[in-house]
Curated annotation (Swiss-Prot):
Residues 187-416 form the Sigma-54 factor interaction domain. It comes from Escherichia coli (strain SE11). Pathway: Nitrogen metabolism; nitric oxide reduction. This is Anaerobic nitric oxide reductase transcription regulator NorR. The lineage of its organism: Bacteria, Pseudomonadati, Pseudomonadota, Gammaproteobacteria, Enterobacterales. The keyword DNA-binding applies. The keyword Repeat does not apply. It comes from the Bacteria. Residues 479-498 bind DNA. The modification 4-aspartylphosphate is found at D57. NCBIfam families: PRK05022.1. One of its GO terms (biological process) is phosphorelay signal transduction system. ATP binds at residues 215-222, 278-287.
């Protein structure tokens, strides 16, 4: 089998049809998977010695949340080091990063694997991975044909990175130095709420406005502040963190503004406060709603005039600090109740951001679960940590009152429990490993299987045929919706339907 001009043209056309980078990436790997008839494909971005999935096809959703560090994945490291097509033999001793992550094939190891490093000039920018369950699945394709595929993928990724850089620099003031744009990979999530939040971060990061970040406990407000700072012209200078809720009233002023020797008992030397430490950088004030009214007045003065006074000193010090504040309270209600100054609220909330709770983020919970699974795998030296279908279903139907922080702790606890019940370095997280209270799951709809004299293969095919028919009827013969309902990949479903005689 070889690639025709029509095949390559079709891939190029699909790239042009995409609306936005993400859509183009998805069209690329979906088309490649169909052309190559492989079981899974993925487009990865290379950054800081790790591969970050941008688009996947035929893999579990949580793969999009995983971050594949080279030191923990020897196959990906081999791809990164290679300057050309990498074919891994079926008996390769190097573990495949996608073992257990192909839906419906969790218990099987990936047999065929091809890695295509993607370059922009001499710089590695990503990789395309192709995986199959048959050992000789890619033998029919020559290296030259695979290089053509790599060139198309590299061009698409390189153009996307260039456009991202140019768009971010257009947001800067005319005399500002170029800076790195917000990377979509820094904040995990593809839900509408997170997509909008990322756009707002890109917009406000280029300015010097104060930002008020609101959200429930555990939603990741500190991560938002970090993303704003790292994508701003101040990124070369420090980001200083201060938790206002952990400040005793007696030392709060000193922590913020510093003190001079002898200012109070125990002040044995001069000490800089957080504002001085953040000069020319960013100060992140977490739980800003916990500050006393007296400290709020002093903070307001700094925001108005840009100078501070150390405790015990009459002299003023000029500082250039951008303030990012976060709260889990409704500060408007706090203002009405007289617990927060209205003038300070308006100074801080020049550009308000709201971080959505995890229960409103849809499939983001699975992406985040994949991220935490990969963290646990690296931290505990395991070969793989994967979620069972039951565990994924449970996570998607739990409300997570503690948000992302609760999910992180739940994954870590589940990994420990799973390791205690089975030997080896492979962990499969089941629903029973999670101690969530009163989670109501939708009842499974079991298809009635008639009792007839059939051999095992015929009975299995009859069951598959009837299950697909029922799913198609429930989804108005929409194959993509049917595949989602059956928790399988649409390309695999089409192939199975053809084999079962359900479609031509």
């Amino acid at each position: 089998m070889s690639f025709s001009v029509d095949v390559l043209a079709n891939i190029a056309i699909e790239l042009q049809r995409g609306i936005g980078h993400q859509d183009r990436f998805q069209r690329l790997i979906t088309t490649l998977r169909q052309v190559l008839e492989c079981d899974a494909s993925a487009l990865l971005r290379y950054d800081s010695r790790q591969f970050i999935p941008l688009a996947i096809d035929g893999l579990a959703k949580d793969v999009l949340g995983r971050r594949f560090a080279l030191e923990g994945h020897p196959r990906l490291e081999a791809i990164a080091r290679a300057g050309d097509v990498v074919r891994f033999p079926a008996d390769s001793e190097l573990p495949d990063p996608y073992d257990g992550l192909i839906p419906g094939q969790e218990s099987l190891k990936v047999h065929a694997c091809v890695g295509l490093p993607l370059f922009a000039g001499q710089n590695l920018i990503g990789a395309l991975t192709l995986d199959g369950m048959q050992p000789d699945q890619f033998d029919v394709f020559s290296d030259e044909e695979l290089r053509l595929i790599a060139a198309l993928a590299a061009g698409a990724l390189s153009n996307a990175l260039l456009i991202e850089q140019l768009e971010s620099q257009n947001m800067l003031p005319g005399d500002a130095a170029p800076f790195e744009a917000v990377k979509q990979t820094q904040m995990i999530g593809l839900s509408p709420g997170m997509t909008q939040l990322k756009k707002e971060i890109e917009i406000v990061a280029a300015s010097d406005l104060n930002v008020l970040i609101s959200g429930e406990t555990g939603t990741g407000k500190e991560l938002v502040a970090k993303a704003i700072h790292e994508a701003s012209p101040r990124a070369v200078n420090p980001l200083i963190y201060l938790n206002c809720a952990a400040l005793p009233e007696s030392v709060a002023e000193s922590e913020l503004f510093g003190h001079v020797k002898g200012a109070f008992t125990g002040a044995i030397s001069n000490r800089s406060g957080k504002f001085e430490m953040a000069d020319n950088g960013t100060l992140f004030l977490d739980e800003i709603g916990e500050l006393s009214l007296a400290l709020q007045a002093k903070l307001l003065r700094v925001l108005q005039y840009g100078d501070i006074q150390r405790v015990g000193d009459d002299r003023s010090l000029r500082v250039d600090v951008r303030v990012l504040a976060a709260t889990n309270r409704d500060l408007r209600e706090e203002v009405l109740a007289g617990r927060f100054r209205a003038d300070l609220f308006h100074r801080l909330s020049v550009f308000p951001l709201s971080v959505p709770p995890l229960r409103e983020r849809g499939d983001d919970v699975i992406l985040l679960a994949g991220y935490f699974c990969e963290q646990c795998r690296l931290r505990l030296g395991l070969s793989r940590v994967v979620l069972s279908a039951g565990a994924r279903n449970l996570l998607q139907h739990y409300s997570f009152p503690g948000n992302v922080r609760e999910l992180e702790h739940a994954i870590h606890r589940a990994v420990v429990l799973s390791r205690a019940t089975r030997s080896g370095d492979e962990v499969i997280l089941e629903a029973q490993h999670f101690a969530f209270p009163e989670v109501t799951l939708p009842p499974p709809e079991a298809a009635a299987v008639p009792v007839v004299k059939q051999n095992l293969r015929e009975a299995t095919e009859a069951f598959q045929r009837e299950t697909i028919r029922q799913a198609l009827a429930q989804n108005h013969h929409n194959w993509a919706a049917c595949a989602r309902m059956l928790e399988t990949d649409v390309a695999n479903l089409h192939r199975l339907a053809k084999r079962l005689g359900l479609k031509d």
